């Protein structure tokens, strides 16, 4: 029953203001804080009752089928309880020095490793508006990047201002330089802009793309969205 609505760009900038701000000790605390604060702020602005509800990034809506991505391990879920919350995340400009290579003598990793993270966030180089996304990384080789260093590296894009394609290309190039893999595929699925998907993919071969994300290159296949999209 509001006579007004919130202008879209201002709403994006408003929710961006929660970035880099400690809202609680646990994910549940953070979501409740944002729910309560945003509900209060927007209700006051529009002079009506508005309810805001945040959901975990990895939730899949009923009926959604994220094609070929159930084989990926989500980085945020890989660590032991408490390990992620105690991790020092202090670099917010892209830094390849964060990446650490490990030789997997213990056999923890398979020859082909697939990582997913919903923590990718950068900013538009023209408007500075926030761009949130999911990154999917698949590579085959004898060297591996440590999960902790990869997560820190993904987070390091948060203050960068680049187009989606540049972010994807940078991640691909950095990993290719340090791992020298036989196959590498990096896919960045971003929150839609004006209803338009901008989902760059960079890979060592068309074969790698066909394996990891066939729905993105087949014009006869409907691309399945992520929860963010």
Q: What are the language-model segments listed below?
A:
Residues 1-229:
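N-terminal intrinsically disordered, cationic/polar leader segments
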